[in-house]
Amino acid sequence: MASCWRLILFLSVTRWLSDYSEALSGLSTSYAALLRIKKSSTSPFGSKSRPRFSSPSLGTISVSPPSWRGAAQQYHSPGNLYHSSDAFRQDESVDYGPVFVQEPDDVIFPTDSDEKKVALNCEVRGNPSPSYRWLRNGTEIALESDYRYSLIDGTFIISNPSELRDSGLYQCLATNSFGSILSREATLQFAYLGNFSGRTRSAVSVREGQGVVLMCSPPPHSPEIIYSWVFNEFPSFVAEDSRRFISQETGNLYISKVQTSDVGSYICLVKNAVTNARVLSPPTPLTLRNDGVMGEYEPKIEVHFPFTVTAAKGTTVKMECFALGNPVPTITWMKVNGYIPSKSRLRKSQAVLEIPNLQLDDAGIYECTAENSRGKNSFRGQLQIFTYPHWVQKLNDTQLDSGSPLQWECKATGKPRPTYRWLKNGAPLLPQSRVDTVNGILAIQSVNQSDAGMYQCLAENKYGAIYASAELKILASPPSFELNQVKKSIIVTKDRGVLIECEPQGSPKPAISWRKGDKAVRANKRIAILPDGSLRILNASKADEGKYICQGVNIFGSAEIIASLSVKEPTRIELTPKRTELTVGESIVLNCKAIHDASLDVTFYWTLKGQPIDFEKEGGHFENIRAQASSADLMIRNILLMHAGRYGCRVQTTADSVSDEAELLVRGPPGPPGVVIVEEITESTATLSWSPATDNHSPISSYNLQARSPFSLGWQTVKTVPEVITGDMESAMAVDLNPWVEYEFRVVATNPIGTGDPSIPSRMIRTNEAVPKTAPSNVSGRSGRRHELVIAWEPVSEEFQNGEGFGYIVAFRPNGTRGWKEKMVTSSEASKFIYRDESVPPLTPFEVKVGVYNNKGDGPFSQIVVICSAEGEPTAAPTDVTATSVSVSEIFVVWKHVKESLGRPQGFEISYWKDTEPEDSVETVRTRGNESFVMLTGLEGNTLYHLTVRAYNGAGYGPPSREASTTTKRHPPREPPGNLRWEQQGSQVSLGWEPVRPLANESEVMGYKVFYRQEGHSEGQVIETQKPQAVVPLPEAGVYIIEVRAYSEGGDGTASSQIRVPSYSGGKITSAQSTLHSLSKWSSVTLLLALMLPSSSW
């Protein structure tokens, strides 16, 4: 990796060697070339971007501002009655003070940048739109004072920036009619790297084994730089190890113990961390003295971290420690009264302790120790961790009535603990008799219009500052009812209470007074003016009717509003019937009658179980019938269980609302029983229990048990003990179950009204094993080979196998004998058994039976049946086999079969093959029964075939016959009949064509076939002729399709082209005339169309 870097750096150096050749003519060629690095290195940032800081360290570059450097933060979340939200501020119709969208970032400007401009960004929103001003080091910048300054929107631009005139702290001040806010401080810093002094450096001479420090003495620079050293010539860099160390704090090169290989020329190379510019120092020669080798000595620490190291939480700190000594010292680290964090890393042969992501508990005293065989030396320093200010509590925008008190509090954390300052409209807030600022609290005893404006709380410690902004609005307006209108007409029923609201808007808060007509309203036991200004009247009567005037007054004016109060008789209601019992499927009408003041309109509302009835979504069960103005009926049709409950009728008038309820009980089939539990299981029984079902207001008369297995068609009712399960029972036994079968059970309840829904199925259980009780059925014999007895049966279903290890016992004996021979078949799926005995003659009768067994024992046998052993395979070959070629692809084969006493044939197999192919390419065709002929098809024409015939049955094949041979017919002529001509006269068509002449490998023409059919029909007729002509009758009107083929012993040849002949009863038409006739008709139509078209279309 190092060699790769060296190559890259070397190439970058040689690219610009010509720039400084004259200026460095006094130096050696290699050193002059190295020095030119400083000119060739430029900022990595092009003309379209600038570096920006993200932390207080000036060594890193980012595009985002630091969170601690005075970043003004606005918080407008709802906090109290008077605040305004951020969404409110974005409403263009609402006026509000300035709010920062973007504050200026720290900027590092490379002095050698091609873009000679610096832009400090500032964006603020507000209504009206804010104006911008800028401050440098706390003093407002006069734009007209320097031609280099310009302001575009809020962005401050400096052309041709200069470090002497322009570096410093910049702030953006945004102002509109509501006040001003000041941004965080943004630092403008210039990045540069000067040149080393051109003076020749003196040689450093030491003894071998002695330690040495080579000074770098870097040139002026900003910000920090990175140090490295070149040995003798570029690109040979000094490699750091336990003996050599380059301090990034001092830039010096430390060699703890000089060796002869260290003799040479050393050059310090520095690189600006921002611009990447590089410069090289003059060489420093290192030589060895001639007065002997340096003896061993104890370590001397030449590089160490400061006594106090200060770093920010979350950053990375690097502490250096290196010593000179002979032998070369070893560096170790420790934390006094603690442990070095596990996240720490040791770099450069342990000379650098690096601790990333610093936390507060990483602080403490750290010690480095340098040790060799001659002794040791240590250094201690303290690591202190600070944190930037961070908000815990911010400000909210606030609006207050004039004269109200204000208390704002902002809180921030940080180490050291932050102090607070307050700004108003961008300027420090000075203490006054009414204004008090203590830490983060701002208190104003009695606000007035002069206090309105933009306020900022600034929390800061020695490492940074943060801003929080808020707007204070002072409200001052006469009373108004525009936003809180009072009902002009209020209706209340007799003996009820009424509240007449009065909440005028105004600042300060208006004082409220009430009048009825011309008289002031006096408070008494029934009448009271509430703190919010509303008028409350209890137990209203006719005497309380009239016009009420509410008046609001403050220092800016008054306003009043009038409300008219009417007192009516209270509404009464009656809902009937009160309590009713029904059965599912029945219907009922509930009647709701209202007695009310005749001047009031009434509205009826229906509820079920406290919820409004949705008449459109209830499936037609409910209907609201309004027959009279003062009553309403609720019709419930085809009632369901879910319709049971309390029905409410509410009558609503403009004055009051009253309601009444009625209860409806619905009887129906029972609900599903509770969880079904299988308590005990045997081979054929299961004891079940369940929770009672809901009877739905009709006692349960009985329960029914149902079961389901993999072998049943759905749920089936099972027999139980007791046979009848009464409604008061909660358990029963299912009986007559099959052993070793998985079952699910469920329970169904029944009452006089009907049968309810079933319970949830029980868990799946399996009955216990038992000896099988079902014997195989349909025991019979099957065909097999000679000397075989084939016994077949229908396998027993798994449902009746009753346990594991199920199999079959096959017993058989020759008919008329006494002893049984038994064989075990272990497969439960087996359906046959083959017994082979060479001494058994064919067709010997046997008595057979098949039994069953499983792991629990043997089960029953089937009934005894008599079957025969297999017959023998045929022993005689067919005779008189004859093969006759029928066509180009067919051979007809016939034979005779010699009847014999054994080996009755089931059919015959014909094997055939081409003369030109080996016998292993033989093909076969089978017949069944006693047929003694077959037609072979799909053969090749003009080919010699050989064939044999043999009989077969279930025992096997008989011997083949003698071989027979024949040659298939030659192919029919492939040339179709040509020059087909026709002449129609009446209902006949005379045809003629040129004769077909076959090729040498084709069969001779025996004649011709004329195929004709009526167009649109699939079936046609054929006329055969030996001459190249024929007469075709056309019996019906229509168009006929005609084609001609030659035929030979090889079959039909290729068809001629088809002709279409229309039936024609008058005159004589030839094929040529038909063509002319068709052309004539087409020409006539074309001419007619041409005459009809306008001339412009031609």
From Swiss-Prot:
The Fibronectin type-III domain, residue ranges: 672-770, 775-872, 877-971, 976-1066
Protein name (database record): Contactin-5
Disulfide topology: C122-C172, C216-C268, C321-C368, C410-C457, C502-C550, C592-C649
Keywords assigned: Cell adhesion, Cell membrane, Disulfide bond, Glycoprotein, GPI-anchor, Immunoglobulin domain, Lipoprotein, Membrane, Repeat, Signal
Any matching Pfam family: I-set
List of glycosylated residues: N137, N195, N396, N448, N539, N778, N815, N930, N1001
Main location: membrane
